C-alpha cells in the first residue's frame, strides 16, 4: 500500500516584519460632538480617545490593506511572490464574495498564494496569527501575510452613541515565517455565543433586499415609484454597528484578562518576563483594568494607540504594535502579550517576539 507523503514541518515561527496604514483625515472629539450630544472631556474620561482616523470615500478597504501589506513585506525583506498564504481579517469589506485576500494577492503579485478572509471582529488579527503559525509549522506554508483592516466609517451611524464615536479606520499587517527559535507562543482562542448580541449590526443584509409591507416581505426593487424612479427610503436602510457597552466592558475586563493570563501561562512566561502588552484597543479603562488584573510590572510597556487611533477592530493590535515599535525600537526581538476580543463574543491571545 502506498504511503501518503507529508510536508516537512518547521519547528518554530516568528513575525518577520510589520506594516501599517493610517488614513490622513483625523476626526477629533469636537468633530464627533457635532453628531452626538457629548463633550471632549466626557469621551476622554470614559474611553481615553482623543482622535480617530477616517478614510476618504475614494480609499477602499483593499487600498488600505495593500499599503500595510507592502510595508510589512518590505520590512520582512520579502516580495509578494514569496508569500504562500494571505489571511485578511475584516468586518467592513463591502463584498460577501470574492474575498479581499484574493484581490490583494493579485495586487501584490502573490498569485497563486492561498488567500482567504476571516470574520472574527476585534479578535481577527490574533486568529490570523494563530492560523499562520500553524500553517508554517505544519509545512503547508512558508511565509504568511496576516492583515487586520477596517473601514468602519462605512458601517457606523455617526448620530448614535453606543459605539460609533469610538471607531476609526486603518490597517496593520505582519509577515509570519519560519524561525530558528520560538517566536510565537501557543494561541488561546475561543468564543462565547451567549453574548452574540453584545456587539452587532442593526439588522441583516436581507432587510435591504426586502421590506415589510402589509405584513409581508416585498422585494425592494419592486418599491420604485414609476413616475419619479425613486426607491422607497425604507428599502435602502443600511445596517450599522451597535454595542452593549457595559456587557463588553465587564467581559473584557475580567474574562479577557483571564484569557491573557492563559496565553502567558501557555508560553511558560511570567508577567515580569514581558517587555510589552498589546491588547485590543477598545477602551483605555479596559486596557488599564486588564493590566491591573494581570499584575503587570511597570517595566512592561503598554500599547495605548487608542488615544490617537480609536478602536479599529481587527486592525487595532497590529496598528498599536507598529506605533509601539516606532516609539520604542528597543522592544524589537522581545516578548509581547497580545489579546483581541470582540463581536461574537470571540477572543484570541498569544505571546509573540516583536519584529
From Swiss-Prot:
Where it mainly occurs, coarsely classed, is: cytoplasm
A Gene Ontology biological process in which this protein takes part is: fatty acid biosynthetic process
One GO location term (cellular component): cytoplasm
Q: Which compartment or compartments is the protein found in?
A: Cytoplasm
**What keywords is this UniProt entry annotated with?**
Acyltransferase, Cytoplasm, Fatty acid biosynthesis, Fatty acid metabolism, Lipid biosynthesis, Lipid metabolism, Multifunctional enzyme, Transferase
Task: Name the domain of life.
Answer: Bacteria
Q: Which SUPFAM superfamilies match?
A: Thiolase-like
Catalytic EC class: transferase
Which CDD domains does the entry link to?
Answer: KAS_III
EC number(s) reported in the record: 2.3.1.180
* UniProt-listed InterPro entries: ACP_syn_III_C, ACP_syn_III_N, FabH, Thiolase-like
Q: Where is the active site?
A: 122, 280, 311
Q: What is this protein called?
A: Beta-ketoacyl-[acyl-carrier-protein] synthase III
Its source organism is Kocuria rhizophila (strain ATCC 9341 / DSM 348 / NBRC 103217 / DC2201)
Lineage at the top is: Bacteria, Bacillati, Actinomycetota, Actinomycetes, Micrococcales
